[in-house]
Amino acid sequence: MHPVAGDPRFFRRAGPFPLSRIAETIGEPAEGLPEERLFSGVAPLQTASPEQVSFLTNRQYSAALRETRAGAVILDPTLAHLVPAGTIALVSKRPILAWAQVAGLFHPLPPSTPGIHPTAVVDPSARIAADAEIGPLSVIGAAAEIGARCRIGPLVSIGDGVVIGADSRIGSHVSISHSLIGERVFILPGARLGQDGFGFDPTPTPTGFITVPQLGRVVIEDDVEIGANSMVDRGSAQDTVIGAGSRLDNAVQIAHNVRLGRCCVIVSQAGISGSTTLGDYVTVAGQAGLTGHLHIGQGARIGAQAGVMTDVAPRSSVVGSPAEPVREFFRQVAFLRRMMRREEAGKHETGAGLG
């Protein structure tokens, strides 16, 4: 039976690696570690074997740690005393990062396979790096540029003039137009970039609304990841910008002229309306909605299902709809609960008096 973690039918495998290589990967000094051992892969605490590395980032799984058979476990220094005999503790102050590094060591991304699939349609004026991969049935438009070591999956549509930087990966069924894509950008299957923004004259004519031409672009900076079935509309007269290092979850909507700073995180089903600007390191949780023309300050956090209708100050946290600062929101919730208890108590007293 195939292992759950790193099933070789789906994931490339490397190794085995000695303990010293694993320690080097996470920046752990090799001195002081137990005897040299070979490790063949990674696995969860519950299923790991003595030849595998596991990890723990949440104390609530400490029972699984005590019972694990893993040969080594990556964990925070404060949890090292829970490691059972026979298991090596690989301590890290950033255990999630360390786990990502070790998992990537054993399961590196597959390299691009240079070449253009015979079923792909590539305009003669497109410039494609010699070591880029163009998948089956993909279409590359006129004057498009595909950078070194890019991997374009099957059934992808790359529009005229689109630029995709080196080492980027575009998943199947993605469409990209009117866009400039940076380096090391990952776009997951089904995403849509560069289509018309939702711009029209709000007063209907006898034949309906008149569309305002959307003359801007989409700019995706370096090291961005865009989730499956997410959408980024091009700007109306300026650019829609996704800042370097940002992450968009699946099913996210970014409207025209929106500008995200560096390392923003937008969680699934969130939507950001036109011309709203996010500073660096902003987090927008799942199903939150932001109206247009807002400014969200650096480091702000938007709670799940929040309805944001006004600007949000830097490093503040808001929840609810309409969104309120977290402390104010829960103060109101507590007040409403007290009022409800008083009302219920009053009903009981009235009923007792009638008896």
Stretch-by-stretch model annotation:
Residues 1-119, 184, 190-191, 196-211, ...:
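Terminal amphipathic alpha-helical/low-complexity segments used for targeting or macromolecular assembly
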Residues 55, 115-325:
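Structural signal for interior beta-strand "rungs" in well-ordered beta-sheet cores
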